[in-house]
Regions:
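Membrane-helix entry/capping segments
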Residues: 1-4, 250-268
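A short amphipathic helical element positioned immediately N-terminal to and/or at the very start
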Residues: 3-15, 84, 88
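A generic "structured core" feature
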Residues: 8-22, 96, 125
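Short, strongly hydrophobic transmembrane alpha-helices
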Residues: 19-44
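Short aromatic/hydrophobic contact patches that present stacked aromatics
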Residues: 29, 227-229, 264
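Hydrophobic, regular-secondary-structure patches
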Residues: 42-124, 131-134, 167, 215-216, ...
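Mid-to-C-terminal secondary-structure elements
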Residues: 126, 131-146, 154-256
Length: 268
């Protein structure tokens, strides 16, 4: 039987069983559309999960002079100096990665005051740069974060944790552009952080100020060490980004070949 005869026979069979053929074609079409829909939904879900983890700071890692997760017996390594941290930030060039420098200038003992309201003396004061909020997975609920100009000029501006804002402002108040004091030092509020809850190491009872401002206003504060944080857009870039960061940090710390790392790197 020739090809032409086969095609003719198939067409006659389709015409003879038109209803059955239409049902079969419809079922196949519906099945294909359902499969495409499922695959599209999976891609969207994966993108949403990656985005949510990025919002939580999961696409980042930190370089410190101690291990955050330890039994307390670990001896801290030499402090990471401001010069070392800024040198790292300047030299780190991994793809689309971005770097933040921060340090706790007052640990759990600052008082924040506005008019006749004030917090308990249990507030952390962090000096941070323009990338800290993004890399740390914070969200600004009101106002904004720091600009590069405010970092350069050591501006007296502050972003308040949600618990701090609630303590010194009422729900009817608009805290933005209001003046407050931190341990009797004046600052202007430019932003409020969205609440993270008690599981995030008291991040709601802290205030953020520009790193340059912190070094100027609280120069005698007991800074243990600076923290370098690195964020990447793609989770698949984490391991190579950590590898590059390790190599650069060894150069910054002037470690010789064979010497152990005198810093720790931990994923967020």
């Amino acid at each position: 039987m020739t090809l032409k005869e086969n095609i003719s026979l198939a067409l006659r069979a389709i015409r003879a069983n038109r209803l059955r053929s239409m049902i079969t074609i419809t079922i196949i079409a519906i099945g294909l559309m359902a499969l495409i829909g499922i695959l599209t939904a999976i891609d969207a879900l994966e993108g949403s999960i990656s985005s949510n983890f990025a919002t939580l700071g999961a696409n980042s890692f930190s370089i410190r002079n101690f291990n955050e997760i330890s039994d307390g017996d670990e001896t801290p390594k030499p402090a990471i100096s401001y010069k070392e941290a800024t040198n790292f930030k300047k030299e780190y060039q991994f793809r689309s990665a971005y770097v933040s420098i921060s340090s706790v200038f007052i640990r759990g003992s600052a008082t924040v005051k506005q008019a006749d309201k004030k917090t308990n003396p249990n507030v952390d004061v962090l000096g941070v740069d323009e990338n800290f909020i993004t890399i740390g997975g914070y969200t600004i609920s009101s106002g904004r974060g720091f600009s590069a100009t405010e970092l350069e000029s050591a501006a007296r501006v502050v972003v308040l944790g949600s618990d701090v804002a609630k303590k010194i402002f009422t729900e009817k108040d608009n805290p933005i552009d209001k003046g407050i004091s931190i341990n009797n030092q004046y600052f202007r509020v430019i932003g409020i952080l969205e609440a993270k809850g008690s599981s995030f190491m008291q991040s709601d009872t802290r205030v953020l100020i520009p790193l340059t401002t912190a070094r100027s206003v609280f120069p005698q504060a007991g800074i243990d060490s600076y923290v370098i944080s690195v964020g990447v857009d793609n989770p698949a870039d984490m391991e190579p980004a950590i590898g590059d960061a390790t190599g650069l940090m060894r150069q910054v710390r002037k470690l010789r070949i064979g010497e152990e790392d005198d810093f720790t790197i931990s994923k967020s």
